[in-house]
């Protein structure tokens, strides 16, 4: 499994069943198993542990995630900043996760809940494959994640929303050039497939989508899709204080994953840094001698 599962707490690993608890042959959903036997391990229980009486601004929130599809694959990228109200909580949070062999998810919203949700989702996919002997279809993965988002609705209504952006490579699609697919969700768990080739979520999503609208082409390759994803995050950070741009001094750059016929994998840091530096240098040259 991907490295993202290595950071899942032991109590959430699909291979760990507490003594005396029977899974039940008809339960192929690890989330439903937790709901029945260990509800305190569900992401929405995290909201109760945080205390819903606390102001949402007192809890770290993650922003902004973008996805870009290209013939034969899809790129998912996210900035690194998490905020608490007007404060920067952290500059290097991880918001992009490999969830199984052919999917990846990015998170926006209440960081603690969102991270636990996507980790549990990864375990859910592994658990299903172990029991059924086959992986879930991409549409099945989308339905499972939508159900998990819906389960957090109560906390979302209290200001603790957690919203993912899911990308995947659909090995069952008839057209190989259309197998990279993008799905977004609202806080009530409704799913939306994005057919325009790109999507963004989080506080900087309006600015990121405006950037992608100008940069996107249907004939992109992997490298150019990564470049415009990073540039969209750069543009979002330019106007949204909750989105972190490339930090040249600290060498903190966005994180990204690519999902294609070869599977899901993280984009190496060197490629992302090179893309970010190229954007910064080009923008600096464009503004040279102009207004500051």
Curated annotation (Swiss-Prot):
Residues 1-62 form a propeptide. Component of the proteasome core, a large protease complex with broad specificity involved in protein degradation. One of its GO terms (biological process) is modification-dependent protein catabolic process. It catalyses: Cleavage of peptide bonds with very broad specificity. Pathway: Protein degradation; proteasomal Pup-dependent pathway. Its EC number is 3.4.25.1. The active site is at 63 (nucleophile). Keywords: Autocatalytic cleavage, Cytoplasm, Hydrolase, Protease, Proteasome, Threonine protease, Zymogen. It is found in: Cytoplasm. PROSITE patterns: PROTEASOME_BETA_2. This is Proteasome subunit beta. It comes from Gordonia bronchialis (strain ATCC 25592 / DSM 43247 / BCRC 13721 / JCM 3198 / KCTC 3076 / NBRC 16047 / NCTC 10667) (Rhodococcus bronchialis). One of its GO terms (molecular function) is threonine-type endopeptidase activity.
